[in-house]
Design a protein with these regions (language model features):
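Glycine-rich, acidic/polar active-site loops that bind/position phosphate-bearing ligands
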Residues: 2-281
Length: 281
């Protein structure tokens, strides 16, 4: 089946989308004023999935929400060449959250951005735009895309050249002096404050290896949530003098970390792959 491009399906729903965006934008600006936010961090990723951030003052946010923030894309690996360098970071107001780890005396917020060309077209090097385009193509033929990842990572005592694990535990193990378990608990509280629901977390099979499983949601929101989770895990570990890493194989002879991702397509609120005539569904 040929799936239409995004541009073939937006005409009828564009006014509703613009109205929804304006309502979300108004909510963001009102929240910033009411909560006394002093700094807003604009987040996006490069083509390798590295987290990028630009900080602006609340006074600049309304203009940036309307017009985007222009920056030199050639300074970011894989984005653009010098001769065609300028791109726009356009905040998605639906992703705004207050940062729970910010100094209470100086509240900060964060918002994910789409990267576009100066003419407003999608920038091909922006992973979020690539995902959005494919989500829209699936929606055009009646499908909603959902996913739920199992995020695995290691905690080490420091960031030195020889990794030192915090424990010798294995799958589902728990000890009364489990420092890493406490780090996971703090991370879950942080994710809850960021409106990211967690299904469960536990010690994985390898020493000092852990897993956090997020509750399934739409693919674009989940991509943002995974980026936020990675930052939260590292931030909380760093505050305790511990080093967290998501690299796939940090220890020789020990199973590595992955991110199993459960994908599903729904049509009219029903699982498109469910077959009630089959015993196993």
């Amino acid at each position: 089946m040929e799936i239409p491009e995004t541009g073939d399906m937006t005409t009828d729903i564009r006014p509703d989308l613009e109205r929804r965006r304006q309502n979300q934008q108004d909510y963001v600006l009102r929240t910033i004023e009411e909560r006394g936010v002093r700094l807003v961090r604009l987040w996006f990723t490069d083509v390798l999935g590295r987290h990028k951030s630009v900080a602006i003052s609340p006074a600049e946010l309304e203009t940036v929400l309307d017009e985007g923030l222009q920056f030199d894309g050639s300074a970011i690996d894989g984005f653009s060449r010098v001769q065609e360098s300028d791109v726009l970071a356009r905040p998605d107001p639906s992703t705004f959250e207050l940062l729970p780890w910010a100094d209470p005396s100086e509240p900060s917020g964060t918002i994910f951005c789409d990267i576009t060309n100066l003419d407003g077209t999608s920038f091909e090097g922006d992973p979020r735009q690539v995902l959005r385009r494919n989500v829209d193509r699936a929606r055009a033929v009646g499908f909603e895309m959902f996913c739920a990842p199992e995020v695995e990572f290691f905690y080490f005592a420091d960031s030195g050249p020889v990794p030192t694990t915090l424990d010798r535990a294995s799958y589902f193990d728990l000890t009364t002096t489990d420092v890493a378990s406490d780090l996971r608990k703090q991370t879950l509280h942080m994710l809850e404050a960021l409106s990211i629901p967690v299904e469960y977390s536990f010690h994985e099979d390898g020493p000092s290896q852990h897993e956090i499983d997020l509750q399934y949601t739409d693919a674009l929101s989940m991509a943002d949530s995974v980026m936020t989770l990675r930052l939260a895990v590292k931030k909380i570990a760093m505050d305790r003098g511990v080093y967290a890493t998501f690299m796939p194989k940090p220890l020789n002879g020990v199973q590595g970390s992955g991110m199993h991702t459960h994908l599903s397509l729904f049509r009219d609120g029903e699982n498109a792959f469910h077959d009630p005539a089959k015993a196993d569904g």
